[in-house]
Amino acid sequence: MDFNYSNKSIELQESLLKFFDEHIYPNEIDYDKAIEESGDPLHIPSILEDLKEEAKKINLWNLFLPDENHGPGLSNLDYAPLAEIMGRVWWSSEVFNCSAPDTGNMEILAEFGTDLQKEEWLKPLLDGQIRSCFAMTEPNVASSDATNISSSIVSDGDNYVINGRKWWTSNAINPRAEICIFMGITNPDNPPHERQSQVLVPMNTEGVTIVRPMHVFGYDDGYTGHPEVKFENVIVPKTNLIGGEGAGFKIAQARLGPVSYTHLTLPTTPYV
């Protein structure tokens, strides 16, 4: 296997490093100061939106997507050094629309979503107009094995009724998170890897409740935090199903593989 970076990746690395020198590093203090002075841990500094517009102008946008219709079409190998650079400042990945969990959610919608789902949710995510969350991990089971997931997605005519508790639901507490990808059981009698499905749940749907923020070593990560979320008799149309009933585990594997790889690159640079 050739581990050399493509010319496109090298050019993007140079452009990204220049952007950091000119825009990211000079705004680190102002970013922290804006949150501190607001007195609101969920405050989103306006500088983020300003920097996003600058990034869009020079095509430093949606760098993670291998689909050339939505991004530069980089392989995981070519994207890795870009993720390493973004890891130098913890909030910078959002400037380039490359932050979790939106990256994995956009990959799901790009690969498995219907045309309607892409128009309603993928497009505004790609444009950076909204943010999203991913609800898979549960407090009552060992969720690293997704076959243990116990939340239910029950058919009811043209709708699904969703019940369950999730936690470490990254970004669910974000005021701009408008859509959630929820994983639960639709087909309990199927083989273990074919019981789960994934559905789109708008965060303003009745029955969706943020229970509490979760803390990691004392930090709650503010507006990008990972809260516990309760879904109680949440009703969504069946058109919100992604990839068909029983496809949830397969979709989760497709999502978590590349995302885990790129997440590992993010924290490497500051410590080498």
Ranges and model annotations:
Residues 96-116, 145:
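N-terminal glycine-rich flavin-associated loop
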Residues 234-250:
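Long, acidic (Asp/Glu-rich), low-complexity accessory segments flanking structured domains
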Residues 1-99, 116-120, 124-127:
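Amphipathic, small/basic residue-rich leader segments at the start of a protein or domain
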Residues 128-137:
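A short, Trp-centered hydrophobic/proline-enriched beta-strand micro-motif
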Residues 148, 206-234:
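Flexible, small-/acidic-enriched active-site or ligand-binding loops
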Residues 158-159, 163-211:
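A short core secondary-structure module
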